[in-house]
Amino acid sequence: RMLDKHCTLYQDIVRVPLILAGPGVEAQVNDNLVSNCLDLPVTLASLLGFAPPEGAHGQSLFGPARKTITSSGNGQQFGMFNSRMITDGHLKYVWNLTDIDELYDLDADQGECHNLIRERYDSPALKALRADLYADLKAHGDPFIRHGWLDGQLLGERKHKPWRESQ
């Protein structure tokens, strides 16, 4: 039942705790920020008083809070990884290029065992996550978005829906 989880986008893997301490860091703060490991170089540079590295994809954890975060693996040297995900901390959408997409309610299903993609395929919340994922992948030159030929699939217009054929 967990064979269709694709790559390594499990919530237990992509949601990693972080502890920061030192000058300029507020003590005893427990925050459920939506962030990315790519935010660490930018955050550390800002704490040390440096400008962020040119072309850095992250943003400082001490700046404006994000509403969503994306995750993708472009490890073509190790194989073909064709899943991308976005979460707002409550809903998690996984775009699977060659298979059925995944949608999880992280508040109700922390183990990501009940894929809601069929029930909520046309929901405004999912459409918003797809649009945000597309914008982020486009901004960072993701190889599946770069040339535009998969835009319709990610944005939901041309995604194959095998569960609708059986009805």
Language-model-detected regions and their locations in the chain:
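Histidine-centered active-site microenvironments of extracellular/periplasmic hydrolases
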Residues: R1-E26, N36
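A contiguous, mid-protein "functional segment" used to position or interact
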Residues: I117-G148
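Active-site rim elements
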Residues: K5, G24-S35, L48-A51, C113-R120
